[in-house]
């Protein structure tokens, strides 16, 4: 499994031994805010920070390089060379602001670490990156609903400010749908479907259709699952 905070600090200490770490870098703090990072992620984090420091002819790795490396490892490399219009920048800024505002106001998500309108190598026009969550053994229903709300925040901002919508929310919608699907089929969070595990480990967004196709459940149950997934997402919106 992925290391806990103690394990992450130990991994960071191993990979920091041969690197010039500045006085402002606190490995314990880095360990606390990198929940979900694997050992390889942590190694990459320090390696990327070292490369960034070297490019700037710095004698030591500072917290600034650590922050930049966290973004690269967690989100993907920014494509600063990609030319985007002022209109696209403005749309992206509104979209990402929608995510950031919900990270700020909802109690069980966030806080925000970075908001950017610089495109990433993964194809996103921008990104909003929260501080990684603390190590948790489980998720609550309320936390999952708030995660869905945050995912939909960009689309909401587009509607409210632009009076139009864009394709920029496609990955957000996919994440929201996947979370709602898990709530219904895996975690028993739907009163309508009850405490039954309908999870088939499929990535198919239209879970009901997939279940009906596999003959695992009847058409009525498959339709009920789709309806519940849709209801959860729409209620969060």
Per-range role (PLM):
Residues 49, 61-64, 68, 136-146:
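Catalytic donor/gating beta->alpha subdomain of glycosyltransferases that bind UDP-sugars
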Residues 91-93, 100-237:
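Soluble catalytic regions of large protease machineries
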């Amino acid at each position: 499994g992925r290391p806990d905070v103690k394990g992450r600090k130990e991994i960071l200490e191993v990979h920091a031994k041969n690197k010039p770490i500045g006085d402002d870098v606190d490995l314990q703090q880095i360990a606390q805010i990198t929940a979900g990072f694997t050992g390889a992620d942590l190694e990459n984090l320090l390696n990327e920070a070292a490369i960034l420091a070297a490019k700037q002819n710095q004698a030591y790795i500072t917290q600034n390089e650590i922050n930049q490396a966290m973004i690269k490892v967690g989100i993907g490399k920014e494509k600063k060379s990609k030319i985007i219009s002022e209109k696209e920048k403005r749309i992206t800024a509104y979209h990402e602001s929608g995510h950031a505002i919900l990270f700020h106001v909802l109690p069980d998500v966030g806080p925000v670490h970075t908001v950017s309108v610089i495109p990433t190598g993964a194809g996103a026009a921008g990104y909003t990156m929260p501080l990684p969550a603390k190590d948790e053994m489980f998720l609550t229903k309320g936390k999952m609903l708030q995660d869905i709300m945050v995912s939909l925040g960009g689309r909401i901002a587009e509607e409210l400010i632009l009076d139009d919508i864009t394709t920029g929310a496609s990955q957000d919608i996919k994440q929201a749908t996947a979370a709602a699907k898990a709530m219904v089929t895996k975690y028993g969070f739907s009163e309508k479907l009850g405490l039954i595990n309908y999870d088939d480990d499929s990535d198919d967004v239209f879970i009901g259709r997939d279940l009906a196709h596999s003959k695992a459940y009847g058409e009525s149950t498959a339709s009920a699952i789709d309806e519940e997934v849709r209801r959860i997402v729409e209620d969060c919106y």
